[in-house]
């Protein structure tokens, strides 16, 4: 390999990886400036020399015309090929002149206007030119074509790459191997790639990388020619040992081999001179382009680059800080492993870096992680990593980003289900390994790991569904459930549960349902083609399930873990096909079985699914089938009411309450979907509540819930009725009052005896809030419905709030016993918070009372409650122009809680906790006024402060702590002028007061004043510093910070220049010392004056 003539001079310093966007280089000696001037003079002289020395061509001669190569690159890319051919012709006529034109284009592509005189080309030193170019960049005489947004330069990068590629292709039969032209170009490109200006490095790296890529293209062509020549030589040698033909072939073979060797030497030169430095450049794009190019080189020219000497750079950059670089390395490796012939050579590399490849499946960048998973698939395909290393990857099946889950799902399908990478025979020998039964059987083996958590099962099924066709083989799944598949035999109970989950989820996916909730909650939109696919899937599902659906229901009806999913399948079927296929009896059998399942189970999920299924059949089926479904729904309703009546009778007789509880749950689930307006039922429930006060807490909850649901449906029917009768209104009001009486009774019972638990308390809070919202007066302003308007009195409201406040203090952690309880999400403490907030947000009750009470609990009960209260504040802020009164009242409520704890003689820890909660409330509320909000809501803050001061001095010094804890955080949000006014107001209130009588009582007042004074001084000092800085900047230039300079060439870093830099720094320091003292002592003088005024005031 030919060494670079300036190799030692251009040796790379480690600091060269740092960026210098301003284009400053290492300090050159004095010749740098002369070089720059000389180069600019040269440009003018060159033009003159060309005009004087070059004879005008005769018309008969066909010299190629002179052209500006940079304009070709900046212009239309289609003209590059022709321009290159013309330039090659010029090079053949005048190599020096054409070379200087090419080098000028190279410099101009980097953004610098610089040229070399053709007659001085051989004497010109590369480093001298590069130093001049760096000086041009430092002087700002630089144009960045790559990053330019000009329309005419949008294709500059592609055109520049195309130019060098066309040039090498055009020169492959001549100048490419003359060891002059491209050696000269490479020297300049390598030198420019190691300079500090980023634009030089970017453009030079782009050109250098393209040179190697184009060299590889030519080398591959020559390699093919060499193989052809070798075959011809072997064939000819068999005919005769020597002769002109053999000599000609030997000579051609030798020349071709020599040319390939020359190209490989040039590739190595660019790799060692450019790539090994720029692959760790500070610029992300440069690093990424290096790795992308290396991947192309290894793939397209493995004879040279497919070895650990080059592969290690791809492994190292797997740890790059930039996601784009990591992804480029992963993509390059993925393409390498796709080629089976590359795998043996990659053995040592795989052993060294496979762990990092697996780790990257959990990369912080999602696109890089997806690429890493694809790479791991390739490693598995070649059996380069053991299965034991894949455990962390399978955990990503339940990761949040959908793209990651889908990529892992594809890996799981290929490796564990389809077993594409496994050379061993199937575990179920004798069967087709690609059959649906085998794939489903393997999927069930995976689902066994998640059997205890149905949600995780759904995640796994969703991940694999897109790749596993067997999940859409409905007949196969049904036959396995019915134990009719001879290839798999009977399934275990666990597998049957998972198989029904798989069937249900797969059906929902097939008809376009979203089974995994998205974080953005955006509505799904499907194209016409997608909707057609979903409709066809719905037909296929119906046809497959039609005859077997009743059998499945009969087999699994009694199993509560399976019945819910199985029953809901009918919702995704095309019911009209039952009539078209003459399968009415199968439909009727299915509806009967769903009705039977409703009365066989008492769990929420099963009941909800049964109600959903039978109401769907009643509304979506047609003709006779719809009549049948509606009849069965009516039979279900009547039978349920009879069971409730019978259960109430059993309770009256002193029997167990379980039957009543189960049937009340069934009635509640039914009323969530449809009205059950049977007046006698409401009266019977109300009477039971009134007469039996010792019922189980859960039974009371469902009695109250069903009364509330009846009222809601009754109100809905009256509002939508064209003719409203007075009797119906009176009946509704009577039933409403009955419900309020029962709620009031239990509300008092909870307050007095504490005999009921949190479940009933939270239910009462929620039912009261919902019912008050239903009957709020603003809904019924006029007309007959005005009678329905209702607003609770203050006593009722205070009791409601007291109960809510008690629920706030309950733990938000769910006990292990309660985790599996039904309706747990409807009975936690968040329900009470939401209920109270809803009353304020809906203007059901006066917000001046309940609003401050709720907000006073901000930050006291954990993140869940705090988040709900913050949402209320945000809502009030949007709705109200001024909420300062609510803020102030909430602070007063917190103060009264603290005072109550203090006066009651409670434990000191409780008092301290109450004080800290009050302090956090003030900090949280005042913290909402940040940035521009301080000016926007200035009057609001001022109102809180002034009213708060008034409240504090209403009973001074007893209430003065209110100043320090509650008002001070708001006061510090005001401007200096407002703070001074507040200070004067407070000082005026204590002028004629002897504060020494109770020093501790008055201490909060003095703390308040001192803090405000410090705030004023701090702001004034900052303002003084700004003014002083402005004065100094106007008087003299800014001091330039000393920075470590990057040096391009060691011998050109003169010590004289370093000394001049140090001298300049000393002079700047001296100027700092000579700055007027008045600027430094002004703040101190003002501080002393303010302290004097304060001492006089006291």
UniProtKB/Swiss-Prot annotation:
PROSITE patterns: SCD. Part of the cohesin complex. Interacts with DEK3. Keywords: Cell cycle, Cell division, Chromosome, Chromosome partition, Coiled coil, Mitosis, Nucleus. Residues 275-360 form the SCD domain. Belongs to the SCC3 family. Its main location: nucleus. Expressed in roots, mature leaves, buds and seedlings. The keyword Lipid metabolism does not apply. Residues 245-265, 632-653, 888-908, 1009-1032 form a coiled coil. One of its GO terms (biological process) is mitotic cell cycle. It is found in: Nucleus; Chromosome. Disruption phenotype: The null allele scc3-2 is embryo lethal. The weak allele scc3-1 exhibits mitotic and meiotic defects. Heterozygote plants are dwarf and partly sterile. Reduced chromatid alignment during interphase. The gene is SCC3. Pfam families: HEAT_SCC3-SA (PF24571), SCD (PF21581), STAG (PF08514). Residues 1-68, 1027-1077 are annotated as: Disordered. It comes from the Eukaryota. Residues 1040-1050 have a biased composition (Basic and acidic residues). InterPro entries: ARM-type_fold, Cohesin_Scc3/SA, HEAT_SCC3-SA, SCD, STAG. SUPFAM superfamilies: ARM repeat. Essential component of cohesin complex, a complex required for the cohesion of sister chromatids after DNA replication. The cohesin complex apparently forms a large proteinaceous ring within which sister chromatids can be trapped. At anaphase, the complex is cleaved and dissociates from chromatin, allowing sister chromatids to segregate. The cohesin complex may also play a role in spindle pole assembly during mitosis. Required for centromere cohesion maintenance at anaphase I and for the monopolar orientation of the kinetochores during both male and female meiosis. Also involved in mitosis. This is Sister-chromatid cohesion protein 3.
